[in-house]
Amino acid sequence: MIQITLPDSSKRDYSGPVTVAEVAASIGTGLAKAALGGKVDGKLVDTSFLISQDSALSIVTAKDAEGLELIRHSAAHLLAYAVKELFPEAQVTIGPVIENGFFYDFSYKRPFTPEDLVAIEKRMAELVAKDEPVTRRVLPRDEAVAYFKSLGEYYKAEIIASIPANEDVSLYREGKFEDLCRGPHVPSTGKLKFFKLMKVAGAYWRGDHHNEMLQRIYGTAWATKDELQQYLTMLEEADKRDHRKLGKELDLFHIDDHSPGLVFWHPKGWTVWQGVEQYMRKVYQNNGYQEVKGPQLLDKTLWEKTGHWDKYRDNMFTTESEKRDFALKPMNCPGHILIFKQGIKSYRDLPLRYGEFGQCHRNEPTGGLHGIMRVRGFTQDDGHIFCTEEQILKECVDYTTLLQKVYTDFGFKNIIYKVATRPEARIGSDESWDKAEHALIESLRASGCEFEISPGEGAFYGPKIEYTLKDAIGRQWQCGTIQVDFSMPERLDAEYVGEDGARHRPVMLHRAIVGSLERFIGILIEEHAGALPTWLAPEQVSVLTITDSQAEYARGVAKTLQNQGLRVNLDLRNEKITYKIREHSLQKLPFILVVGDKEMAAGAVSVRARGNKDLGVMSLEAFAERIASDIAQKA
């Protein structure tokens, strides 16, 4: 007798071993039809999995997160099946699930074309319509290697050969196609109705640039037609908001082949940068931070002490001078400890808060670079707080409150909070971890935040809070963080004199609110679709003349506004006013002021707000008050 416990705690008895599919069928035909897999004692399995002992079982359907994972995993194999049908000489390699979809890498004699993608997608739909069952079998490793070699699938054979010899491997078959996979999979191809192939890109075999360049086909798959359409619509909107496209259209920045992964800021883009930096500088000044500046080039021995040399060496730019090895800093924290160590520090000095707009460099692979959001050189609003364990709670509460205000000012209202707790491998006593985790959790509770716990996802040297922004089209961007660090003060011998007169190690809190300024500006551009709020816009007002006769008056208007600290563009060109209005509107300016003879005679301006809103004629003084109010309110 086998007893199955269901999620509602009800129990069902079966006379002998039973599959997940059979349990689903015994509950109801609707559930049997919807079943994609099961979770047996917490482990995700196929519907064909045989349960041979008393177990807890939940049936997984397309409504579950695990169900969507199964759909995407199986869709990757369906893609490989279709490619092998159409291009028999192609060799299959790997095909994992990724965020919102999947990909599969192929080796083929020529690049796949957009027309090929259309044909592959069509064949996938045909295979779905056939509703072919997906079956699993297990082979000894060496037998599996020989099997795939006999098929001419040498990449797959190489993967299997790297598995320990005493391990069996599982294969999944659908129709004529069989692939190596741990599984689980959906029960049949008919469960994979809602998918779309997105693009083809290059990818090196095993991620090594010394190996062959493969072709990676990306796709997306969803549980319903509506979800697929919503995702495709979101992608269309994201494309319109793409910061790389808007950066060019609005003349903000460019990336040049002469310096891959580094940003050339144009005058307007640098104005935005300065707006963000000066705002964050005031945040430092108003919240007890002392701004510091450390060198970019630091001796290798420092990075060896901190542990970065062992873990991040491949991502560091290095150089040699006078028989000494140096590295461009990938992060600012060691430099801040060196500043902290200058002079004796007392418990009365704590908490001591340092802030820096620190320029860092990381040798990111070319394929991972993405506009100004993923670069090799970036500047962080990097702060470090040196404090005692007892001070962690208050510092975290204050930091969260500050972060919320900053994000609100930049137009972000939706923040997701996560606490990453101790991993298995860690340093420090359990007592210290207890205090640190308690402080982080209580700081969020005190701030009125709902939050998630991410067990085991803290760093080996301390727990952290991650602050993730949700943007206008539902995408998530992890920006802010506050990280407790017990390790680095120990490694670099940072000390303070306690109230007892003895030497003590400070706790170090790593914190950043916007993180990389480059990335944050990219997020801002996409969040606002290029129409940055008035206080941050590179040009806040354009003054346009209708004819040459208003030129002198327009200059006076522009000068008056500039004297009030506004960023003003003056357009005196002898062009049609409709043309000029359209041109400046495309630059997404907050306000356009048109001056003709009537406005000049009245000492006024005709005001157009962004979005083609005609605010009518108003005095220059009234307009100045209006825009000043918008700026003050961060509108």
UniProtKB/Swiss-Prot annotation:
It holds the Pfam family tRNA_SAD. It is an enzyme of class 6 (ligase). This is Threonine--tRNA ligase. The lineage of its organism: Bacteria, Pseudomonadati, Pseudomonadota, Betaproteobacteria, Burkholderiales. It catalyses: tRNA(Thr) + L-threonine + ATP = L-threonyl-tRNA(Thr) + AMP + diphosphate + H(+). HAMAP family: Thr_tRNA_synth. Binds 1 zinc ion per subunit. Residues 1-61 form the TGS domain. GO terms for biological process: threonyl-tRNA aminoacylation. The gene is thrS. Homodimer. It comes from Polaromonas naphthalenivorans (strain CJ2). Its cofactor is Zn(2+). Keywords: Aminoacyl-tRNA synthetase, ATP-binding, Cytoplasm, Ligase, Metal-binding, Nucleotide-binding, Protein biosynthesis, RNA-binding, tRNA-binding, Zinc.
